[in-house]
Amino acid sequence: MARAARGEELTIGFLGGSITQGSLASAEDKTYAYRVYRWWCDAFLQAEFHYVNGGIGGTCSCFGAARAVGDLLMYQPDVVVVDFSVNDKGETPEEESFYQETYEGLLRRIVSWPSSPAVLVLNNVYYDSGKTMQDRHNAVAEHYRVPFVSIKDSIYRKMKEGRYSLEELPPDGLHPNALRHELVAGEVIRLLEEIRAWGE
């Protein structure tokens, strides 16, 4: 964030599945990814920002690792948000281990990229079941000292407490409506604002 505060030119990138792509949002500017990008623009008016969205529906971290360069890293991002916690479907311990390995390969590729991007892990959740690969993904994130956001521990928990209904959030139990995109963006922005405050 120091570079943004100095007014430098930065690229904000996103890599994930259909939620990152913007599934069910009424317009691009209503997606969580674009809302997070707009936070950077509004928080650092002196800087110039570029937006790259590498979200493709139905893709897991294995495919994400294969397409990371062409869909995101070739643009030399300075900040990257990674979201594959619901696309990495670990139905068995063996599958969980497999996706943890592919996720580690993806995260390693991003953090070691020459542009040295700051990385943030976003963990979405199946609202109808609570399933997510966040525990496995967060273990990888902790290894690389990458901060993470848990939607299961925030929005999903509030839903279970009765503050939201399942019908208010994803119409199919997973993919976000406009409200959920806004809420997810809010959780990411909350962490970004905490990081910004630590640096001041």
Specify the residue positions occupied by each region the protein language model found.
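Solvent-exposed loop/turn segments at secondary-structure junctions
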Residues: 18-21, 56-61, 86-91, 117, ...
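Glycan-recognition surfaces in beta-rich domains, encompassing non-catalytic CBMs
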Residues: 172, 176, 197-200
